[in-house]
Amino acid sequence: MTKIGLPYVGRLQVYERGEANILFVLGQLKELQPNADYSHLTLVGHSNGGDISMFCAKRHPELVSKVITLDNLRVPFVLDHKLKILSFRSKDPNFKTDPGVLPTPQQAKADDIDIVNTKFQHTDMSDRGPDAVKETIQATLDHFLSDSASSELAPANTDKLIVTNLGPPPYP
């Protein structure tokens, strides 16, 4: 557990390695596509990947414009930069968010941070989770990425699927 005054105990090297990986891939992409925009990145991650995304956004605000986390538990949200943040939170008693990671409801509102509380389990929010969970998350994610106002963003209805039949593959 991260303790106040002792940030990232036992995890700092993991976060720094994740940050280095992101920067390495960014460098490789710049060589392949030199004219692309690399100063408005959207970082996305589940659990530790969400922590790494938030850690990297904190250290490289000049590169990151959006962060999407799926139940990150250890790294506090970036509040001192104007990032667009969406965070899906699980309702899993086995995976508890460390104190100080989430902003207060007042801070989230003031900084236009969208926090979506779900009824999902932590591990179901990964790419190995049930299709129904992924579809529900995708619907909210699509809305967020469309640059809609955060005040219009609401928790996705997890009881009723939006997409029930995708049809035959391949998918775009």
Regions of interest found by a model, annotated:
Residues 119-132:
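Catalytic histidine-centered segment of alpha/beta-hydrolase-like enzymes
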Residues 102-110:
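Short, conserved catalytic or adaptor-binding loops enriched in Gly and charged residues
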Residues 17, 21-24, 51-52, 132, ...:
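Extracytoplasmic/secreted proteins, especially bacterial periplasmic and envelope-associated proteins
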Residues 142-172:
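Alpha/beta-hydrolase-fold serine-hydrolase catalytic core, especially in secreted/extracellular enzymes
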